[in-house]
């Protein structure tokens, strides 16, 4: 079957010009422009690979659920194993299914209710330490806070002394990651380039911290009911596998929430009416409005901004689109969530849109979907809402001078500092 022969799309050189020289950073703009010209399902090629992009909820459901067995994780996710190893985000079945069963109890609702006490305490402590009327980088602050919460709740450890080191190492590795997706990425991994050396040093730093944590907990021997206790008790997980799962949870367990909180602060600083309602809700205990704020933040800035799969056999989708074996298929919640026919006035920050009818299934997928849906979704939603309420009870935020842009890397993080000023209410 010729690759995607039923689909239109941009020519090879148009694609190259659009994505050169930094494909990942330019990918959202390329997708927006191509959707406008070719619609919500199209094919495109680069010299080394054929691609299909789907932006229809029903087809995304096929990709992630009804025809999931025709696909494996994409090349980008496989390259991500350099950072995370064979953790939940990167592994395939049966390993993924087995390890998900091991870790899943740590994310049950009763456990999250216990974690909420840590989230509330640490969120309130951060709010109390914040200096009013001084500009600060919201993303750096939220990264440090959420990393502390993740280590306390998921790993039963206070790694506050090394929180900055861990955050810096993760940031460096994720910044270097897109370069490894290029055709010369495999070669870059082996050359003694400065950026490559920095990547491997950062990984070594994280490995040292994680293996030390594993050793301490093995010596301790107690079952604390957290994710690390479950991994240590599993007969299926040696230290290497535990390291891979911890690395994945380190990244996903704080990065997702740090980004969500940063984008929430950024949006509320620009929408004072929403901010006032959210603050009033936080003070009165109205969790429903705060939940809608969080839901709307994740619509505009979904953590799983790009989803990639590779077909392992020829596939025909329900709309007749034909996908040849070996084709990379992308879906993008970042594009999907801004479709005007699904979300009227899609660029408007409007938490009350969630009072109306729910969008169609798989039209709103900030954490992905199907069997690979983010295991920590409920954890992230709870943490974002709890910390945001702690901040809103005391402060309103104003933007400080500086440009804010997205960095579409492993997650949808800011490209640089998000400078804001906290004003006492």
Question: Can you say where each PLM-predicted feature lies in the sequence?
Answer:
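Conserved cytochrome P450 K-helix/beta-meander segment immediately N-terminal to the heme-binding cysteine loop
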Residues: 314, 331-357
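Conserved cytochrome P450 K-helix E-x-x-R motif and the immediately C-terminal K′/meander segment
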Residues: 20-39, 208, 212, 284-319, ...
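Cytochrome P450 heme-thiolate monooxygenase catalytic core
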Residues: 1-7, 71-80, 91, 95-98, ...
């Amino acid at each position: 079957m010729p690759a995607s022969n039923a689909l239109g799309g941009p020519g090879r050189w148009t694609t190259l010009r659009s994505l050169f020289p930094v494909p990942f950073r330019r990918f959202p703009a390329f997708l927006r422009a191509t959707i406008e010209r070719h619609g919500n399902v199209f094919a495109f090629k680069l010299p080394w690979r054929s691609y299909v992009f789907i932006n229809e909820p029903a087809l995304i459901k096929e990709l992630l659920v009804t025809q999931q067995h025709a696909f494996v994780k994409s090349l980008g996710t496989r390259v991500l194993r350099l950072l995370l190893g064979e953790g939940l985000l990167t592994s395939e079945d049966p390993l993924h299914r087995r390890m998900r069963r091991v870790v899943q109890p740590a994310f049950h609702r009763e456990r999250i209710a216990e974690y909420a006490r840590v989230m509330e305490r640490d969120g309130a402590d951060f709010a109390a330490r914040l200096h009013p009327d001084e500009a600060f980088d919201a993303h750096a602050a939220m990264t440090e806070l959420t990393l502390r919460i993740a280590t306390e709740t998921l790993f039963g450890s206070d790694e506050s002394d090394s929180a900055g080191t861990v955050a810096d190492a993760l940031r460096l590795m994720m910044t270097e990651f897109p370069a490894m997706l290029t055709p010369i990425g495999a070669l870059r991994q082996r050359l003694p380039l400065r950026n490559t050396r920095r990547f491997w040093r950062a990984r070594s730093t994280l490995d040292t911290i994680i293996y030390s944590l594993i050793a301490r907990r093995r010596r301790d021997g107690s079952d604390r009911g957290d994710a690390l206790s479950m991994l240590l008790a599993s007969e299926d997980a040696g230290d290497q596998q535990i390291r891979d799962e911890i690395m994945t949870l380190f990244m996903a367990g704080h990065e997702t929430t740090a980004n969500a909180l940063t984008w929430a602060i950024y949006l509320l600083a620009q929408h004072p009416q929403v901010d006032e309602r959210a603050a009033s809700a936080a003070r009165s205990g109205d969790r429903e409005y705060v939940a809608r704020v969080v839901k709307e933040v994740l619509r505009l800035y979904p953590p799983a901004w790009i989803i990639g799969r590779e077909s392992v056999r020829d596939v025909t989708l329900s709309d007749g689109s034909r996908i040849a074996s070996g084709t990379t298929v992308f879906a993008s919640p970042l594009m999907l969530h801004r479709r005007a026919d699904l979300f009227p006035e899609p660029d408007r920050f409007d938490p009350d849109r969630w009072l109306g009818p729910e969008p169609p299934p798989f039209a709103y997928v900030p954490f992905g979907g199907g069997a690979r849906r983010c295991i920590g979704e409920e954890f992230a939603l709870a943490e974002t809402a709890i910390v945001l309420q702690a901040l809103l009870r005391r402060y309103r935020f104003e933007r400080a001078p500086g440009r804010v842009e997205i960095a579409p890397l492993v997650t949808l993080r800011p490209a640089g500092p998000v400078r804001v000023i906290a004003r006492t209410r």
